[in-house]
């Protein structure tokens, strides 16, 4: 016990009275990362989730006590309870914790406590934050700085989404979906872009969302640094309000770290970054798309400003294998009508879907793009309906799955049938609605052609479905 208390006192001095930490929704990407870091710091970790999966199994094998299902008795012995943003006050574990006077906090509040005693680098934005966080983490690792990192998705090069390092550096994805990133007080903040999403959090008011980002950036100390995308109109609009040092990056001629001469061949991207001092750095990436060049340049800017050598930056970016479910190639397969490539991608916002399609078009100009799209949440489908119609009309063939509700009740006019109808009326592509995913393989075999690139797109169960499809095609 003495060794445990000494360790806690050293790493997180103010949490020395905390022994057991319970996570409700421990299987989620963001929650599991923090749980894993704290488990490795020596805390007793327990947690619950509605279903067993690879993440819960891994945590259990590492020493966490994992419950499947939410029950009041699961919080017994906890010093504090960390609740996922998907968990509300009606959850039996939340109710039991409050009745027992156990503190119930958000994920970001726990992340903030871990960051408090470290040199924090927080990455926020509507799109690209998971990949950018992963890239920064790998650069610092390549530079032998042994950072702690907590990411919202798998860092493929590391084989995990979180790591407890021995240095003072903590690199973390910052979550704007519930505005909980306001708890964080980093030394460096990155904002990749700002677009309307999760608008229920902001009362449907985009101005409120922008103001919240400004508050997040003002959490930087006066000597901190904001690294912001020059290509995003909203990001540039709020930059003068930050009141901290700001450096920009992007394709824009006004960017401090400027991208030039981008070229893509298959999965590989080449470009040059012109730095504020005029230095020119040639970058090689093995992940496709201009959006990944932006992510990599944000990571490069952070690393350069913190004094990391070019050799480490370029080696890490060249070796970067991507983040989980970001243009993730599942394989090439021989089907009755020819050979096809299957790719899984997490993008579920129109902008994310758009850049994925563009990456596919740029790297594989002669291939048809066949998309399997699963809308994520009725509210997002409603709020961005017209944008989805325009973006999804860019593909050569479209299979639409039913909306992945993520706990939401259906909204009239915001379902997959309505999307299909509006896309069909636009006249560019004739979507096929597949309500029974067991029939997906059969439907695909009827429409695919030799050389097709098939994109399985969305944040819900479409990844599991597409990976099951890949396994069946291997047989």
From Swiss-Prot:
> Under which name does UniProt file this protein?
UDP-N-acetylmuramate--L-alanine ligase
Origin species: Actinobacillus pleuropneumoniae serotype 5b (strain L20)
Q: Which PANTHER family match?
A: UDP-N-ACETYLMURAMATE--L-ALANINE LIGASE (PTHR43445:SF3), UDP-N-ACETYLMURAMATE--L-ALANINE LIGASE-RELATED (PTHR43445)
Q: Which Pfam families match?
A: Mur_ligase (PF01225), Mur_ligase_C (PF02875), Mur_ligase_M (PF08245)
Picking any one GO biological process from the record gives: peptidoglycan biosynthetic process
Its lineage reads: Bacteria, Pseudomonadati, Pseudomonadota, Gammaproteobacteria, Pasteurellales
Localization annotation: Cytoplasm
**Per the record's keyword annotation, is Cell division included, yes or no?**
yes
Q: Which UniProt keywords apply?
A: ATP-binding, Cell cycle, Cell division, Cell shape, Cell wall biogenesis/degradation, Cytoplasm, Ligase, Nucleotide-binding, Peptidoglycan synthesis
